[in-house]
Amino acid sequence: MMQLSRGQRRWLAAIAVLLIGGFFIARHLMAPVPVNYQTVKVVHRDLQQNVLATGKLDAVRKVDVGAQVSGQLEKLYVEIGDHVKRGQLLAMIDPQQAQNQIKEVEATLQDLNAQRIQAKAELHLATVTLGRQQNLAKLQVVSRQDLDQAVTDLAVKNAKVGTIDAQINKAKASLDTAKINLDYTQISAPMDGDVVQITTLQGQTVIAAQQAPNILTLADMSTMLVQAQVSEADVINLKPGMKASFTVLGDPGKRFSGVLKDILPTPEKVNDAIFYSARFEVPNPDRLLRLQMTAQVSIQLANVDQAVVIPLAALGDELGSNRYQVTVLKEGKEEKREVTIGIRNNVDAQVISGLSVGEDVIVSRGGTGDA
């Protein structure tokens, strides 16, 4: 028998090791790779479909309080943040000009009353004179010219009284206006509210020639108005009466609720995107909400109590209108199902048919080496 050298034996041993290693590697590669399934159970729970938006808070009632007469703002009785009651004195404009106007009109009225007394006396005299002339005319002891003169004089005196009466009425109206202007120098609160802005400072002069200059702004903070900016894709699904709620950044755990009031028809363009203002009111008895706060708004489109629910991640290929393919893991094996879904939100979908509560639906799959 031929003896192998030491080198040949080493080569044969190396080849044997390679053959054995290759066999095990090939066996490993040909073996089926175990699949790890991530599944979620089909459950019963309440499901809502919402439109999400960002909005701003404003007061339902906000009034600019202005001056209706010109003059210097002599006194300002409030500061920003003060709560005022309806009728409370807020500011006063220098009343001297209005007071002088009243004095002038009263003097004019007094003079007109004196003129009227004189005119009435002259009218009485003219009436008596005409009567006397008419009696004399019957006796034919007065000329026709004198009689006509007496008639004319009576008419003139009567017209003079009428003119003075008209002037008196005009002066009375001017006096009423002057008194109203004096009242206007006292600026009072038209409603209960908080002073949220002061536009004119004490000592400044206001001119009310064309429009009432603004002195300050009052806001009724007991009820707030939420204006949510809703995209044009979502606004077609909204209608007044829908439930709406929101949270604010300062207290994200507290939710404020209301009912959608209206949707403004005029859009707002922001970076080439179109948004519409959906508005609703919320009570603010504790004054927690403030002007221009940012609101994270949710408007409820639909709600199903105790719906059959699966995550959106479980939905496979779309098979038709609201019909999808879903894979169920049953006894370790995949089973394809066709399901019909109802409402959905950004996370879950309602199952109308095709699945039962408790079944496991596959949301992802991967091999043993997958992270």
From Swiss-Prot:
It holds the Pfam family HlyD_D23. GO terms for biological process: response to antibiotic; xenobiotic detoxification by transmembrane export across the plasma membrane. Signal peptide: none annotated. NCBIfam families: PRK11578.1, RND_mfp. Part of the tripartite efflux system MacAB-TolC. MacA stimulates the ATPase activity of MacB by promoting the closed ATP-bound state of MacB, increases the capacity of MacB to bind macrolides such as erythromycin, and provides a physical link between MacB and TolC. Confers resistance against macrolides. It comes from Yersinia pestis. Homohexamer. Part of the tripartite efflux system MacAB-TolC, which is composed of an inner membrane transporter, MacB, a periplasmic membrane fusion protein, MacA, and an outer membrane component, TolC. The complex forms a large protein conduit and can translocate molecules across both the inner and outer membranes. MacA interacts with MacB and TolC. The gene is macA. Its main location: membrane. Residues 94-127 form a coiled coil. This is Macrolide export protein MacA. One of its GO terms (molecular function) is efflux transmembrane transporter activity. The keyword Nucleus does not apply. Keywords: Antibiotic resistance, Cell inner membrane, Cell membrane, Coiled coil, Membrane, Transmembrane, Transmembrane helix, Transport. The chain crosses the membrane at residues 11-31. It is a single-pass membrane protein. GO terms for cellular component: efflux pump complex; extrinsic component of membrane; macrolide transmembrane transporter complex; plasma membrane. The keyword Transport applies. Residues 32-371 are periplasmic. It is found in: Cell inner membrane. InterPro entries: CusB_D23, MacA_alpha-hairpin_sf, RND_pump_MFP. SUPFAM superfamilies: HlyD-like secretion proteins (SSF111369).
